């Protein structure tokens, strides 16, 4: 693959439907060097499922020659936007932390 495509891919965050990595997201990580994956409610079920999903994606990136691990993000703002709910630790919304004025 052309180096320019891999460099572009390193700046891309990809998402996907379902609780298993889709063929498209695997191709983007493997063939185009996508360096970041974001998870939404549609991707998460239980801690064990998410851990296995992340392990699979990290192994795919490693096997594809990524120099660094994937950055895996979750759309988790706290409050109403909380993709990881119990049994995960639930944090207050960031605006509540901001109101403390200690930042």
Question: Locations of the language-model features?
Answer:
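Enzymes and membrane/adaptor proteins characterized by extended Gly/Ser/Thr/Asp/Glu-rich
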Residues: 28-103
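Short, acidic/polar
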Residues: 17-30
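Boundary/entry segment of secreted carbohydrate-active catalytic domains
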Residues: 1-20
């Amino acid at each position: 693959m052309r180096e320019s495509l891999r460099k572009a891919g390193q700046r891309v965050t990809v998402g996907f439907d379902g609780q298993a990595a889709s063929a498209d997201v695997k191709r983007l990580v493997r063939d185009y060097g996508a360096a970041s994956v974001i998870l939404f409610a549609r991707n998460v079920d239980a801690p064990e499922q998410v851990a296995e999903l992340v392990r699979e994606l990290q192994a795919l990136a490693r096997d594809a020659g990524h120099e660094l691990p994937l950055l895996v993000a979750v759309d988790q703002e706290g409050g109403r936007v909380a993709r990881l709910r119990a049994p995960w630790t639930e944090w207050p919304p960031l605006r509540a932390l901001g109101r403390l004025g200690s930042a």
